[in-house]
């Protein structure tokens, strides 16, 4: 990724124990439907409870040395859900921005929305643009919401954008490498995630940050998303801190033994 500053400059690529620098944590917020079902509630109430969990987690992340928090809000595959549920999920983004935007802005939070804007209704597109515009100058903390996002779609869109530059004579095929390609991803302005968390006990990444997660540590937690908050996040970060990030190399102790 291009060099970054402020809260985005959160991790290095030297091997060894997980860094104590500010982190980029990404969360697959899973379990809203099961949470509601366990309580005999409609799924929509699970999603609403999930918004409250997001608010708690954003606040907790800011005090846990997290510089960037990326959350999976709505995937490109979620359009296949019942229309009423899709409408509710769209409305929740709008409600969250309208209720919390000023508080986030005053707290120094920069809001970024990654994913395709095509297919979104004008009112949702306007809310997204307003949130990004209102917080564009903030640098204390980055809240990145993946909305109408899919990892495969992001890679496809990036490939298409580069191909279009070649067609216009602005680039050559030989210009393409990992570094130049990732500049076309919607995630280009943030560093790769250090830690990807999935809640609910499921153990898969579900088309989330496919390019970006190459060297991320994965933590799977059994807690359903509406029950999530600062304590669960702290537990995930503690597990991450105990790991040895090698980036394809070997641990320092292994090198010493081999020598």
From Swiss-Prot:
The keyword rRNA-binding does not apply. Catalyzes the condensation of isopentenyl diphosphate (IPP) with allylic pyrophosphates generating different type of terpenoids. Binds 2 magnesium ions per subunit. Homodimer. The gene is uppS. GO terms for molecular function: ditrans,polycis-undecaprenyl-diphosphate synthase [(2E,6E)-farnesyl-diphosphate specific] activity; magnesium ion binding. Pfam families: Prenyltransf (PF01255). The active site is at residues 30, 78. Mg(2+) binds at residues 30, 217. Substrate binds at residues 31-35, 43, 47, 75-77, 79, 81, 198, 204-206. Its EC number is 2.5.1.-. Keywords: Magnesium, Metal-binding, Transferase. Belongs to the UPP synthase family. It comes from the Bacteria. One of its GO terms (cellular component) is cytosol. InterPro entries: UPP_synth-like, UPP_synth-like_CS, UPP_synth-like_sf. Its cofactor is Mg(2+). SUPFAM superfamilies: Undecaprenyl diphosphate synthase. PROSITE patterns: UPP_SYNTHASE. This is Isoprenyl transferase. GO terms for biological process: polyprenol biosynthetic process. The keyword Metal-binding applies.
